[in-house]
Structure formats: structure tokens, C-alpha cells
């Protein structure tokens, strides 16, 4: 009887906590009871198989709810993305005790630790990523020119768009920092006959990119290296163009200036640099659940802080573009592909991992849709370049 009474007390405390999220009405179900939160017809239902202690919700709302979902103690009845889209728009009401989460929220930005963090995500296995990415193996925001563009077409569009922005000419040298599986450099070599170098910390990406270079006979045009961006100045490289797509988020707030310093040292005077990154309106340490399970050490920079750092290296801004809704659509494609291949994925990973990954893709799509995060491309020059067209050429 005492246990039942205690459970009921914890249940009511939990419901009282959830009553702060009233922007969209929803149902909360427990084993023997249900509660209607907000006014109007419920837009989704959260089914709790176990009560989450109030202390856990107060310490980190996202961690408590995210881990409950991973364990199967929490289920969403209906469409996961739609529920998250309603709920995550209210992330400002989440509780986060940063001092109690120091190890998760503020991990070391040392070389050794960052290499470990990057490989923990990107070295899960190429076979896994091939199941839900498109044929290009692009793990970044696509660019949907037409409403009915496929994911593959959107990724081709994105790379074409970036290469046009870089104003490439035959024989130029191009560095890709965080080159992934190499699609951008392969396209640049084929279409513009540039000489490209890609650097990555991921052994899986390195091996696959090397295989692709040989497969397509591009050994005279492309090289890939396992390298930390901090080692670039030591190599005495000089490039006409530099690009970095979806890598800045791994650099860490303490290293933004160092990252840009390294780019400045290897970019020729007047050279173009395109920086493509997830951003936020304001500086924030990040989400505890994402930092613990998906991107350890990852931090989303604000647009304004990157612009401030750029000035220190005499980078002149040519253009800034926001592709937020393109990333929302990209993630929804990934999430659908992930679900369509769930039977194959079950042979690779356990249920908890698969629930975690599904939650990650759906939650990220929802945060982009709600403008909690953005996707920016900044096109800049090292110093002044008066030889470029006066109007946009892309």
C-alpha cells in the first residue's frame, strides 16, 4: 500500500512538472490513470510505463525524458516527429542543472578527447550510415531546389551550390576540413579539375574516401589525410579555397578562434572560405542528452560569435545564408530511411541504440523546424578580393 501511495505521489509530482508545457494540448498516460495537459483536443499522447522521479526531470528534462524513451519506459502514441515538434518548441521551459552535469556539458577540448568524441559518432560503421544516408553518403544538410527533390538530388544540389559559391577554376587547390566520405571533393575534381585535399579524424571515413578516389581514378587530383585541423599550419600548405561543412560543431567554443587561425594560415591572400555549420541565435552550452549520447563534446556556435572571431583573422564576409528548413527536410528523409531499414539495423544494434537514433533524428528535425537551431553558410575572403564579381554569381 505504501509503495502504491508513493508511486501516486511521484506520478502527481511528475504531472505537475509537465503542466508547464501547455502550448499544445497532450495526454499523459500511466498504468492506471491519464491526465489532459493544456486546453483543447490533445495533439499527441505520452505513455509512461514508469514514473520519472521529479529530481531527474529537474536535473535535466531532456536527459530524463530521452533516457526513458531509450529504455522503453516512455512511448509516444502516434507520430514521434509531430509530438517532438510540438514539445521541443518549448525547450525554454526545460530544466538543466549545469553544475550537476559538468562532465557532460563541459568536456575537454584537447586533441585526444576530441578525436575520441568524433570517432565515437562517425566510426559507428559505414554499413550503418549507408542504410539511411543517400548514395553520396553526405551527412549534412541538403539543398532542396524543388519541392519534390529526392534526398540524393538535394545533396547533389548542395554540393553544386557550395562549389559555385567558391568560384572555382581549373587547377585551383581546395581544402575540405572534415571531408566526410569525400563526395564534395570528388565532385569538385570531376567538374572543375581542382586539386583537393580532405582531412578527417574518422578512420571509417578515411578508408571509404580512399577507396572512392581509387575507384574513380582520381589519384592525380585528390588526397585524404587523417589529420587534426590544428596540424594544418605545420604542413606549410597553401590553398586557393577552403571549405568546411558540418565540422565546426565539433571544435568547441574555446577553439573557434584557433580553428579560424588555422584556416587563415593555409588560405592564400584573397582566397575564399565557405563555412557551413549548425548555429544558434545565442551562445549556449548545448543539450545534455545530445551531448551524452549523440555528439559528445559537440557545441552549437552562435552566428554572431563566429562573425566576431572572423574579424580577428581579417576574414571579410561576402554572404550569409540560412538553410534551416532545408535541414529539417533532410532530417525527415533520414528518419524515414532509418525506419524503412529497421529490420537490417536490428541485426547491427540493440533496441536501446535504435530508439536512441530514431529519437535523435526526429528531435533534430523538430529543433530546426522550431528555429531552436539554424544552418548557416558564410562565404568569406581572406583580406580583400576585388577580382570577384560585384553581384552574386551562384
Task: Give each language-model segment a name.
Residues 1-155, 161:
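Feature captures hydrophobic
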Residues 170-178:
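Conserved class I S-adenosyl-L-methionine
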Residues 181-192:
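Conserved SAM-binding loop of SAM-dependent methyltransferases across substrates and taxa
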Residues 217-230:
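Conserved SAM-binding strand-loop segment of SAM-dependent methyltransferases
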Residues 230-242:
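A short acidic, Gly/Pro-enriched loop at the edge of an enzyme's catalytic core
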Residues 257-269:
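A short glycine-rich, Lys/Arg-flanked "PGG" loop and its adjoining helix->strand segment in the class I
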Residues 270-278:
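Conserved beta-strand signature within the Rossmann-like core of class I S-adenosyl-L-methionine
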Residues 278-388, 392-394:
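Substrate-binding/catalytic lobe of Class I Rossmann-like enzymes that use SAM or dcSAM, i.e.
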Amino acid at each position: 500500500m505504501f509503495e502504491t501511495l508513493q508511486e501516486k505521489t511521484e506520478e502527481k509530482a511528475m504531472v505537475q512538472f509537465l503542466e508547464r508545457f501547455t502550448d499544445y494540448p497532450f495526454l499523459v498516460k500511466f498504468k492506471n490513470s491519464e491526465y489532459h495537459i493544456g486546453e483543447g483536443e490533445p495533439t499527441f499522447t505520452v505513455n509512461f510505463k514508469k514514473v520519472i522521479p521529479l529530481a531527474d526531470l529537474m536535473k535535466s528534462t531532456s536527459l530524463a525524458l530521452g533516457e526513458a524513451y531509450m529504455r522503453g519506459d516512455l512511448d509516444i502514441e502516434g507520430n514521434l516527429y509531430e509530438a517532438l515538434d510540438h514539445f521541443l518548441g518549448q525547450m525554454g521551459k526545460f530544466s538543466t542543472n549545469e553544475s550537476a552535469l559538468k562532465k557532460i556539458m563541459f568536456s575537454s577540448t584537447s586533441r585526444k578527447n576530441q578525436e575520441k568524441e568524433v570517432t565515437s559518432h562517425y566510426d559507428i560503421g559505414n554499413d550503418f550510415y549507408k542504410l539511411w544516408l543517400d548514395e553520396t553518403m553526405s551527412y549534412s544538410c541538403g539543398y532542396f531546389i524543388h519541392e519534390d527533390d529526392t534526398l540524393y538530388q538535394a545533396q547533389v544540389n548542395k554540393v553544386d551550390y557550395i562549389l559555385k559559391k567558391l568560384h572555382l577554376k581549373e587547377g585551383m587547390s581546395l581544402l575540405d576540413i572534415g571531408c566526410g566520405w569525400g563526395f564534395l571533393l570528388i565532385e569538385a575534381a570531376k567538374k572543375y579539375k581542382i586539386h583537393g585535399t580532405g582531412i578527417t579524424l574518422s578512420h571509417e571515413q578515411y578508408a571509404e574516401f580512399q577507396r572512392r578516389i581509387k575507384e574513380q581514378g582520381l589519384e592525380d587530383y585528390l588526397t585524404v589525410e587523417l589529420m587534426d585541423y590544428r596540424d594544418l599550419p605545420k604542413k606549410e600548405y597553401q590553398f586557393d579555397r577552403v571549405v568546411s561543412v558540418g565540422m565546426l560543431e565539433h571544435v568547441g567554443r574555446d577553439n573557434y578562434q584557433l580553428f579560424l587561425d588555422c584556416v587563415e594560415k593555409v588560405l592564400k591572400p584573397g582566397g575564399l572560405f565557405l563555412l557551413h555549420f549548425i548555429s544558434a541565435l545565442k551562445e549556449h552550452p548545448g543539450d545534455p542528452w545530445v551531448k551524452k549520447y549523440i555528439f559528445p563534446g559537440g557545441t552549437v556556435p552562435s552566428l554572431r560569435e563566429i562573425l566576431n572571431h572572423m574579424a580577428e583573422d581579417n576574414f571579410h564576409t561576402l554572404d550569409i545564408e540560412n538553410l534551416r528548413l532545408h535541414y529539417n527536410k533532410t532530417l525527415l528523409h533520414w528518419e524515414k530511411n532509418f525506419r524503412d531499414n529497421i529490420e537490417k539495423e536490428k541485426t547491427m544494434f540493440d533496441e536501446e541504440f535504435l530508439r536512441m537514433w530514431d529519437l535523435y533524428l526526429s528531435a533534430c528535425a523538430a529543433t530546426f523546424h522550431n528555429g531552436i537551431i539554424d544552418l548557416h553558410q558564410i562565404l568569406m575572403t581572406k583580406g580583400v578580393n576585388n577580382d570577384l564579381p560585384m553581384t552574386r554569381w551562384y
